[in-house]
Amino acid sequence: MNLNFDLIASSFPLLLAGAAITVEITALSVGFGLLIGCMVGIARLCNVKALRYLANIYVDFIRGTSLLVQIFLVYFALPGIIGSRVDPFFAAISACSINSGAYIAEIFRAGIQSIDQGQMEAGRSLGMTWAQTMRYIIMPQAFKRIIPPLGNEFIAMLKDSSLVSVIGFEELTRRGQLIIARTYASFEIWMCVALIYLVMVFLVARFVGVLERKFETK
């Protein structure tokens, strides 16, 4: 089998542009997911029963359904409710953020519960409220412990973001599909796409490892 290196060279800039969009989607989704996950994770541990109940429903629903279905719900079902078309970028970020938020909520919950209960009791004995103790004592310690699973979530979303290609959003996978539709060189293009994903995952894993070692020394 002869590889078309000229085609690979000419297609590579387009694929790299798609990879940049993939990184953008992942960063935004995990960023918003952090905000959602932090609030939901704390809500699952608070003393307000209604908040705990709603947080549990959200986490169970998102973790119990596929990201692809969630993308379809936002892109195809939501317009029927709001009466207007949903932009693919908005649909991609919304679905991925909501999905990531549920998994990050579990990461935060596990991280908080890994801190000794005596820390909360010590904070309360000093006159701090539950929220103040959580903010100033529990969360700083928990955050150091959740860096590795947060890195794993970023890597998972980096790969899972390829699912937004089904709504026509031109990230890395969709760019590969469009090039193949024009050139019929499926092997060369998919190998390039796979290698780009591999490099991105490797770089993220290395970065997370550096962060983890940095926090361990503090």
Give each language-model segment a name:
Residues 1-218:
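Transmembrane alpha-helices and adjacent helix-loop boundaries
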